[in-house]
Amino acid sequence: MLKDMFSKKKRYATIPSERAKQEVPEGIMTKCPSCRTIMYTKDLKKNLSVCRTCGHHHRMSARERIDSIIDDGTFKEAFASVKGGNPLQFPGYEEKLESDRKKTGLNEAVVTGEGKINGYPVVIAVMDPNFRMASMGSAVGEKLTRAIELATETSVPLLIFAASGGARMQEGMLSLMQMAKTSAALERLNRAGGLYISVMTNPTTGGVSASFASLGDYNFAEPKALIGFAGRRIIEQTIRQELPEDFQTAEFLLEHGQLDRVIPRLEMKETLTKLLAMHQ
């Protein structure tokens, strides 16, 4: 008996069966990539996709972003029919576009329209990173330009939420032309005395960061957003120097005078309301 008490017992672990795994619907839980906390996805969405534990700002779709900023029942989408093609006959590009259209329900990587923020009218454009990583091709540039022109014609403040991997490589020079196209439209808005508020979210990189996203009368960003043109590794290899750990973060850019403010998502609507009230 004593021998049995002190003998080493084998330990066993129960491995859930495939059937047991399937009982938990996919997407019901979300793990925070910052603090590793596991939470109900619906609770995360209720908090505007901001982690209650560490404050990490999770990715939002364009529709979710609009719902969080624009007053209920006031958003009117514009230019929804504009969508890109495959002008350079890039292999597999059309299939990828169609796949993203089915996945997101969008024709392109930006949603544009008009709405109100606590009663103040705005023209708004929101990029959706779930569609080709919100890269800017001809259609995205066209929709943004039309939104800018609408703000110019109606003398209504323009609000753009940027989130992009940069220019869309499958469209070559046509995608790069959108940098100049959107910037020229913003210059016309500026000459007309219009107000442009730019909010950069994670990530805002490449040709988008080097064009319209950085040309606001006010340039804001969400906390910890990655903002920059070239990648960190490319820059380090070019200048042969090690970059600071927080390089290309919203906080780094704010410290070096390239942003006006870093605004937590839960404070975004209130902050924008105060700003719009100042410019009435």
Curated annotation (Swiss-Prot):
Its main location: cytoplasm. One of its GO terms (biological process) is malonyl-CoA biosynthetic process. InterPro entries: AcCoA_carboxyl_beta, Acetyl_CoA_COase_Trfase_b_su, ClpP/crotonase-like_dom_sf, COA_CT_N, Znf-ACC. Its cofactor is Zn(2+). It is an enzyme of class 2 (transferase). PROSITE patterns: COA_CT_NTER. It catalyses: N(6)-carboxybiotinyl-L-lysyl-[protein] + acetyl-CoA = N(6)-biotinyl-L-lysyl-[protein] + malonyl-CoA. Residues 28-280 form the CoA carboxyltransferase N-terminal domain. Binds 1 zinc ion per subunit. It is found in: Cytoplasm. Pathway: Lipid metabolism; malonyl-CoA biosynthesis; malonyl-CoA from acetyl-CoA: step 1/1. A zinc finger (C4-type) spans 32-54. One of its GO terms (molecular function) is ATP binding. One of its GO terms (cellular component) is acetyl-CoA carboxylase complex. Zn(2+) binds at C32, C35, C51, C54. It comes from the Bacteria. Keywords: ATP-binding, Cytoplasm, Fatty acid biosynthesis, Fatty acid metabolism, Lipid biosynthesis, Lipid metabolism, Metal-binding, Nucleotide-binding, Transferase, Zinc, Zinc-finger. NCBIfam families: accD (TIGR00515). Component of the acetyl coenzyme A carboxylase (ACC) complex. Biotin carboxylase (BC) catalyzes the carboxylation of biotin on its carrier protein (BCCP) and then the CO(2) group is transferred by the transcarboxylase to acetyl-CoA to form malonyl-CoA. This is Acetyl-coenzyme A carboxylase carboxyl transferase subunit beta. It comes from Shouchella clausii (strain KSM-K16).
